[in-house]
Amino acid sequence: MDSITSAASVVAAGLAVGLAAIGPGIGQGSASQGAVEGIARQPEAEGKIRGTLLLSLAFMESLTIYGLVVALVLLFANPFA
């Protein structure tokens, strides 16, 4: 593998992880904000809100994990080699 392809793969891996973390990070923050506001307004619905929040946070976090998988593929199993 030539040096330009290697350097581009490393840059792309960094961008994959970085950009894959921005969207879910913002989404998790706003989802948590909504859950806290909902629990503050209706404390009796705390269990249902918390369960829904945890499930949605797991789905959002999976997007970041997909970015990490793409970065690992670019670094260790480079399809452009």
Swiss-Prot record:
Key words, A-Z: ATP synthesis, CF(0), Hydrogen ion transport, Ion transport, Lipid-binding, Membrane, Thylakoid, Transmembrane, Transmembrane helix, Transport
Gene3D superfamilies xrefs: F1F0 ATP synthase subunit C
InterPro entries: ATP_synth_csu_bac/chlpt (IPR005953), ATP_synth_F0_csu (IPR000454), ATP_synth_F0_csu_DDCD_BS (IPR020537), ATP_synth_F0_csu_sf (IPR038662), ATPase_proteolipid_c-like_dom (IPR002379), F/V-ATP_Csub_sf (IPR035921)
Major location (coarse): membrane
Xref: Pfam families: ATP-synt_C
Keyword Membrane tagged: yes
Compartments where located: Cellular thylakoid membrane
Residues under site feature: Reversibly protonated during proton transport: E61
A molecular function GO annotation: lipid binding
Membrane topology term: Multi-pass membrane protein
GO cellular component: plasma membrane-derived thylakoid membrane; proton-transporting ATP synthase complex; proton-transporting two-sector ATPase complex, proton-transporting domain
Source superkingdom: Bacteria
Membrane-spanning parts: 7-27, 57-77
UniProt keyword Nucleus, yes or no: no
Function: F(1)F(0) ATP synthase produces ATP from ADP in the presence of a proton or sodium gradient. F-type ATPases consist of two structural domains, F(1) containing the extramembraneous catalytic core and F(0) containing the membrane proton channel, linked together by a central stalk and a peripheral stalk. During catalysis, ATP synthesis in the catalytic domain of F(1) is coupled via a rotary mechanism of the central stalk subunits to proton translocation. Key component of the F(0) channel; it plays a direct role in translocation across the membrane. A homomeric c-ring of between 10-14 subunits forms the central stalk rotor element with the F(1) delta and epsilon subunits.
Subunit organization: F-type ATPases have 2 components, F(1) - the catalytic core - and F(0) - the membrane proton channel. F(1) has five subunits: alpha(3), beta(3), gamma(1), delta(1), epsilon(1). F(0) has four main subunits: a(1), b(1), b'(1) and c(10-14). The alpha and beta chains form an alternating ring which encloses part of the gamma chain. F(1) is attached to F(0) by a central stalk formed by the gamma and epsilon chains, while a peripheral stalk is formed by the delta, b and b' chains.
Protein family (similarity comment): Belongs to the ATPase C chain family.
Protein name: ATP synthase subunit c
Encoding gene, per UniProt annotation: atpE
